[in-house]
Amino acid sequence: MSNQVFQFPPYYHKEPFFTIQPILNTRKKQFQMWQDLILQYCRYYKIYELDINESIKSNSVLFNNEKINRKLSREALKSIIDDIIENGFAEWVDKEKEKEKEKDKDNNNNNRVLIMWRKPDEWASLIYKWVADCGLLNTVLTVWEIQNGDDSKKQEFHQLNTTILMKSLKVLEKQSKCQTFSQDENVGVKFFSI
């Protein structure tokens, strides 16, 4: 984590930003701005999961601007998160809760969301390039080595969320660039040159 504080964009300091806009085109632009802000903030602090209830309850600075006395409501935040999910940059952590939500649109059980400020295919490209650049093709690495190893310390995917890493490795498997295998709790990955 950086010692510096995240710099919020100017629009974060405008009161209308915290109120869902009634005009569709304006709301689309507003949701895009919220998506950009949430992804940038999460990337800056390497946040991979957000708990909506906790963010609202704790008055998270991301959703609560005390200087202008404005904060997002839980309903507004859920609408924004739903839009981010629709755009492929997030998903509910508990898939069963997502299914429940489809049955009952007013369901408030969805709380934890996986934030993907890079999509799995982007992470897959970065990981594969790193493996190739380090001369690790046709060798076996553990998921732990990719996430936490000394060789990956300077890589953006160092300490990457396990769920996102596994999704990224699935992308590489579909491209025939790697194969994952597990023994007990350890997951290994063999990367192939193609």
From Swiss-Prot:
* Recorded superkingdom: Eukaryota
What sections of the sequence does the record tag as coiled-coil?
none
Q: Where in the cell is it found?
A: Cytoplasm
What keywords are assigned to this protein?
Answer: Cytoplasm, Protein transport, Transport
Q: What is its main location?
A: cytoplasm
NADP: is it a keyword of this entry? no
Please name the InterPro entries in this protein's record: ESCRT-II_cplx_Vps25-sub, ESCRT-II_cplx_Vps25-sub_N, WH-like_DNA-bd_sf, WH_DNA-bd_sf
Q: What does the sequence similarity comment in the record state about its family?
A: Belongs to the VPS25 family.
Q: How does it assemble?
A: Component of the endosomal sorting complex required for transport II (ESCRT-II).
Name this protein carries in UniProt: Vacuolar protein-sorting-associated protein 25
Originating organism: Dictyostelium discoideum
* Gene name per UniProt: vps25
